[in-house]
């Protein structure tokens, strides 16, 4: 049976979406994750929930230990990961309250630890030149999209986000430039989470919860308070989406997909093929 990792952004760290939740403290070779994980089931499917910013939301985007977060989920045996993330809209038709399922991202962050293969852990040797396209797992993305359609949630099937360092919002000049690039979203946490999942060979997809129009739109300047008002309503939509999507994910055999991703990740590491990287081995591959 598949085990699903859920990375909850602001407001979506509620353990009550799980049946029989159990809190588990986790340490990793890359330090402590943002918080303890919470394990339980949704629709009979095992799940592991992690609050990206901590359950008190006291970790700013640039200080999130993304490597520890992803490793914590890997160490608890998750097979796929779905995530949520609050975003500002850069396009008129992507309205606050809508959901969007990104298919790519433009990285504007600075200084974040974006790879497991930096020499700090002996079981992650070499240098990993992971392919960043496709950024998100298409099979998992399609599960989220079809679930949103079935739940009649207003959503957009494609679009890319610009991930900024934060914690400040964009200047108007930045917002206008991002908009001119054709980006749909601006956000602070889309990177490097998706890339780290690829390095682990774990299917990963995110759901963008649109909260505002950033500052490119004269009459709708973004503020923290305005974001949270819309986000509260979006959280309920995301909970509905994730509860239903987990049930669908549990019906799918992910063996071939995971084998493909782990093989691609291992082939991306510049080191002798004779060197064993434990978390990318495909021997004794889990059967669903």
From Swiss-Prot:
Keyword Cytoplasm: yes
Known EC number: 2.4.2.28
Protein name per Swiss-Prot or TrEMBL: S-methyl-5'-thioadenosine phosphorylase
CDD domains listed in its UniProt record: MTAP_SsMTAPII_like_MTIP
TM region positions: none
Coiled-coil annotated spans: none
List of residues binding substrate: 188, 212-214
Phylogenetic lineage: Eukaryota, Metazoa, Ecdysozoa, Nematoda, Chromadorea
Function: Catalyzes the reversible phosphorylation of S-methyl-5'-thioadenosine (MTA) to adenine and 5-methylthioribose-1-phosphate. Involved in the breakdown of MTA, a major by-product of polyamine biosynthesis. Responsible for the first step in the methionine salvage pathway after MTA has been generated from S-adenosylmethionine. Has broad substrate specificity with 6-aminopurine nucleosides as preferred substrates.
Pathway(s) it belongs to: Amino-acid biosynthesis; L-methionine biosynthesis via salvage pathway; S-methyl-5-thio-alpha-D-ribose 1-phosphate from S-methyl-5'-thioadenosine (phosphorylase route): step 1/1
Keywords: Cytoplasm, Glycosyltransferase, Nucleus, Purine salvage, Transferase
Main enzyme class: transferase
Signal peptide residue numbers: none
Gene Ontology MF, one: S-methyl-5-thioadenosine phosphorylase activity
Superkingdom of the organism of origin: Eukaryota
Intracellular or extracellular location(s): Cytoplasm; Nucleus
């Amino acid at each position: 049976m598949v085990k699903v990792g859920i990375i909850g952004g602001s407001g979506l760290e509620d353990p009550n979406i799980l049946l029989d939740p159990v809190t588990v403290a986790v340490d990793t070779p890359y330090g402590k994750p943002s918080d303890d994980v919470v394990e339980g089931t949704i629709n009979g499917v095992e799940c592991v929930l992690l609050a990206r910013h901590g359950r008190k939301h006291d970790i700013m985007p640039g200080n999130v230990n993304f490597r520890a977060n992803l490793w914590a989920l890997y160490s608890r045996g998750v097979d796929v990961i779905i995530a949520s993330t609050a975003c500002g809209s850069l396009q008129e038709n992507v309205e606050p309250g809508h959901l969007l399922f990104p298919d790519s991202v433009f990285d504007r962050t600075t200084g974040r630890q974006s790879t497991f293969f930096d020499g700090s852990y002996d079981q992650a040797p070499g240098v990993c030149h992971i392919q960043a396209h496709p950024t998100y797992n298409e099979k998992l993305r399609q599960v989220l999209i079809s679930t949103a359609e079935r739940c009649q949630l207003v959503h957009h099937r494609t679009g890319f986000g610009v991930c900024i360092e934060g914690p400040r919002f964009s200047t108007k000049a930045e917002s206008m430039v991002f908009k001119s690039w054709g980006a749909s979203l601006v956000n602070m946490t889309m990177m490097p989470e998706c890339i780290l999942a690829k390095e682990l060979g774990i299917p990963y997809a995110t759901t963008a919860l649109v909260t505002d129009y950033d500052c490119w739109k004269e009459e709708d300047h973004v503020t923290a308070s305005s974001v949270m008002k819309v986000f509260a309503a979006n959280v309920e939509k995301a909970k509905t989406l994730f509860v239903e999507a987990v049930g669908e994910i549990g019906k799918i055999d992910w063996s071939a997909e995971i084998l493909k991703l782990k093989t691609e990740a291992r082939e991306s590491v510049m080191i002798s093929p004779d060197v064993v990287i434990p978390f990318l081995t495909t021997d004794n591959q889990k059967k669903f």
